[in-house]
């Protein structure tokens, strides 16, 4: 697994604290969204996304990893296109409004082909 060092986050990734957050996300990953019940609400204080190249079954591909940093120090991560798209917009919104804490709802759905997918909502 190779990290391509492209990071988008709600925090400054150039500071020591920001770099530690990214390091912890990349090396620890946290709990997978797959293990969360539908509708789980995470009291978050940061979100980050980074690209990594994964080699699954000899098929190398670049993927976006999304990590939500909970206020209690927990990390929640997903490799999911729908989560990545929602999180990218959420990062922009949180950054634009300078939110220090926010509630993220993890939503689970099923596609017309029966595949389970995840997305994010901002909870009030």
UniProtKB/Swiss-Prot annotation:
- InterPro entries, A to Z: Phi29_Phage_SSB
Q: Which Pfam families match?
A: Phi29_Phage_SSB (PF17427)
Query: What UniProt keywords are attached to this protein's entry?
Result: DNA replication, DNA-binding, Early protein, Viral DNA replication
For this UniProt entry, the molecular function terms from Gene Ontology, in alphabetical order, are: DNA binding
One GO biological process term = viral DNA genome replication
Role: Single-stranded DNA binding protein required for the elongation during viral DNA replication by strand displacement. Displaced viral DNA strands are transiently coated with the ssDNA-binding protein and therefore protected against nucleases. The latter is then probably removed by the replisome that performs lagging strand synthesis or during the events that lead up to the recombination process. Stimulates in vitro DNA replication several fold. Has helix-destabilizing activity since it removes secondary structure from the ssDNA in replicative intermediates.
- Tell me the subunit arrangement: Monomer.
Q: Which family does it belong to?
A: Belongs to the phi29likevirus single-strand-binding protein family.
Protein name per Swiss-Prot or TrEMBL = Single-stranded DNA-binding protein
The lineage, from the top, is: Viruses, Duplodnaviria, Heunggongvirae, Uroviricota, Caudoviricetes
Gene of this entry = 5
């Amino acid at each position: 697994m190779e990290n391509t060092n492209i990071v988008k986050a709600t925090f400054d990734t150039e500071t020591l604290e920001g770099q530690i957050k990214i390091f912890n996300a990349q090396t620890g990953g946290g709990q997978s969204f797959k293990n969360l019940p539908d509708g789980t609400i995470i009291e978050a204080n940061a979100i980050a996304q980074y690209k990594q190249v994964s080699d699954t079954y000899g098929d190398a591909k670049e993927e976006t990893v999304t990590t939500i940093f909970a206020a209690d120090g927990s990390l929640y991560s997903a490799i999911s296109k729908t989560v990545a798209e929602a999180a990218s917009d959420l990062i922009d919104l949180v950054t634009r409004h300078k939110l220090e804490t926010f509630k993220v709802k993890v939503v689970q759905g099923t596609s017309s082909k029966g595949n389970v997918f995840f997305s994010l909502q901002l909870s009030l």
